[in-house]
Amino acid sequence: MYLLEEFSVALERTFAIIKPDAVSRGQQGEILSRIHKAGFKIIAIKSMRLTKEEAGGFYAVHRERPFFGELTDFMSSGKIFALVLEADGAILKWRDTMGATDPKNAAPGTIRRDLGTSIGNNCTHGSDAPETAAFEIGYFFSGLELI
């Protein structure tokens, strides 16, 4: 006999960004709708415009990569929405909902395939691991802002 817990995926939180390209095209409503339809609970959300320095701190892991300057310029180019999402297996589930980084390679029906225009303008960001999610959530939200 098996216990139900053996087959369940843990309830977890992940971090998401609706990027400046999506906001400038007015796609945040569609993306928020898809988040809801996918079964996520939005724990926290805020809209803001990052400074280049804030974007650099957030993407510090990429500091030595050749695209770092372009990435921080882009992420500070307009308003973003930062979100904390909760669901069973939230990290993988959000990555599946977003689709592959390059919209051309993303599965049909994913956010990036349907709404993204290029690798650089792919609408969304999502944490790739629990440790990354913890850092990213803490970068944008204090514990008092989380339900």
Task: For each feature predicted by the language model, list its residue ranges.
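Non-catalytic terminal and connector segments of soluble metabolic enzymes
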Residues: 2-147
